[in-house]
Amino acid sequence: MKILIINHFPLEGSGSGVYTKNLAKELTEIGHKVKVIFPENRMVPLEIFKMRPIMFRGDNSKDYEIDFNFPCFTSHPRSNTTFYQLNKKQMRDYIDIMVRVTEEEAEKFKPDIIHAQHLWITPYAAQKTGLPYVATVHGTDLKGFKQDKRYHPYALKGAQNARRVITISKQVDRETKELYHIEDDKRKIVYNGYDTKLFKVKNVSRKEILEKFGINEIPAYIISFAGKLAHFKGVDILLKAAKIYEKQMKEKITTLIAGNGVLYEELKKLKDFLKLKRTFFLGHVNQDQLVDLYNIADVSTVPSRSEPFGLVAIEALACGTPVVGTNQGGLPDFINEDIGALVNVEDDIALAEAIINELIRPDKKERRNRAHEYAVNNFSWENTIKEVEKIYKEALF
């Protein structure tokens, strides 16, 4: 099968970007021919699948096709431009280039099916080709739909003409039905898979990994967070929880926060205000560094106010790290008391208590083993690809 995949973001730095890259790799490895269209603002390394990056203007861009940085629903490590900031001309230019490149690549690549990421502009571009297409709803597109009505005609037209719509969690599925009025028999929940070759239990030196991050003192415990530094990610709640667990626990606890975003400076000021001496902002980390981070952590946290799915939680579990998250969005679909804990949103006291409970458990080794096995058995890309292939076939016949 020849599959053309379109996304709104680069193949790194966002959940949908990582999803798109992994999807393209996995489909290629089992014999499909794949090409991916995606925005970029710098050169990209070769992959095993074909690519057509659309070059946007970044901080260091020289050759670009469109004179502003690629827009996001929230933020991206390489762009703080949002869809909501685009003026009428920029919005028109964005839609035009997405449609034009999709039509050009459909003509050249001649795909059997198109897989659009997000119910936003890419499904609209896909329907312009007249080819069958499916779309995956990642959750941030739902935020965008609620926030900016200018995009409604495009998002709705693309959604309503899709042969099938994939949703990534129960909550995302419910909201997709409410906002886009897509029939039940067109929607299918397919949980995201993770890269089993990359995210796994490793025998690493805590001392060496910390030194790579510029931290020389080895603590008794490590708490990790990985994600965008945006309001919906709830990092401010984690910092307030850190104030509590640092005070209550006699042993030294280090909190490592990986990621960039619009709230970086604001969160650093909050850390200083709370006088957190053992909390470190690592900035953007690559996938290999993320694996190391999870492997040295005792607990990984996802304190989000809303989390469409929570791939970072799956990746942490795959590395044998229990996860403490919030009971909103996609996290309740898979976090249970055998591998972690769920707490109420914006409850720093409950978050701190859940983290402390994980740290003092007598069965931590068994719990880490369970976390890894749970991720492998339930969220491998092998399982995800089987579901996606089935949806492609349903959409074609």
Language-model segments: which ranges?
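Short hydrophobic beta-strand element within catalytic cores of glycosyltransferases
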Residues: 322-325
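Short alpha-helical donor nucleotide-sugar binding micro-motif in glycosyltransferases
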Residues: 284-285, 292-297
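Conserved donor-binding/catalytic core segment of Leloir-type glycosyltransferases
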Residues: 216-233, 239-242
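Aromatic "clamp/platform" in nucleotide-sugar-dependent glycosyltransferases that forms part
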Residues: 305
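Nucleotide-activated donor-binding/catalytic signature segment of Leloir-type glycosyltransferases, i.e.
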Residues: 265-285
